C-alpha cells in the first residue's frame, strides 16, 4: 500500500515531462495521480518539442492564448473539488494508502496545492508549491488566508526574479 501524491500540472498542460516526474515519484514507492486540470474546457494537447513554443495546429501566439484561456477557466474552488474527487478515488484503491495525501503544484498549480492544504487540513499531509504564482492575492480565496488551518507540512520554492510571481505575490 502506497502513500498518495497528487502532482498538479503547470500551465502548458499534461505532457511527457509531467509523466516523467510522476514516474520518478512513483519509483520512490508513492501512488501518483497526475490529472489534466483542463478537462472541463480543452481537449488534451501537447506542446511541440523540444522548445515548447507552440501547440500542434496552432501558431505560437494562438498557443499562448489557448493556454491562458484554459488557465483563466480554473479556480481554487474548482481544483479543490477535483482534489477531493481524487482523494475519494484513492480511498477505493487497494494499492493506495487510505490516509492523507501529498500535493505538488508547479507554477499555476502552486496556489492550488497551498489552498487545498488550508481547506482540507485533515486530508493533506504535505503540500509543495514549486515556482508558484498567486500565492498571495486580494481575492477572498487567496491561499495565504487559510494558512492557519494547515496541519501538514508546506514547502515553497520561489524564483528570485519572476514577472509572473513578484515578491508581493509570494
Q: Which stretches of residues belong to each language-model region?
A:
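N-terminal cap/leader regions of alpha/beta-hydrolase-fold enzymes
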Residues: 1-170
Amino acid at each position: 500500500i502506497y502513500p498518495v501524491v497528487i502532482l498538479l500540472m503547470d500551465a502548458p498542460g499534461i505532457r511527457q515531462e509531467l509523466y516523467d516526474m510522476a514516474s520518478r515519484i512513483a519509483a520512490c514507492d508513492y501512488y501518483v495521480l497526475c490529472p489534466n486540470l483542463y478537462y472541463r474546457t480543452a481537449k488534451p494537447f501537447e506542446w511541440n518539442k523540444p522548445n515548447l513554443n507552440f501547440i500542434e495546429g496552432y501558431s505560437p501566439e494562438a498557443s499562448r492564448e489557448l493556454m491562458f484561456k484554459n488557465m483563466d477557466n480554473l479556480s481554487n474552488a474548482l481544483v479543490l473539488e477535483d482534489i477531493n474527487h481524487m482523494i475519494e478515488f484513492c480511498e477505493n484503491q487497494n494499492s493506495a494508502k487510505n490516509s492523507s495525501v501529498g500535493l505538488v503544484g508547479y507554477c499555476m498549480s502552486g496556489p492550488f496545492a497551498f489552498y487545498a492544504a488550508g481547506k482540507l487540513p485533515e486530508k493533506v499531509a504535505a503540500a509543495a508549491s514549486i515556482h508558484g504564482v498567486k500565492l498571495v492575492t486580494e481575492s477572498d480565496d487567496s491561499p495565504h488566508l487559510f494558512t492557519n488551518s494547515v496541519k501538514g507540512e508546506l514547502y515553497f520554492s520561489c524564483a528570485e526574479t519572476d514577472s509572473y510571481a513578484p515578491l508581493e505575490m509570494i
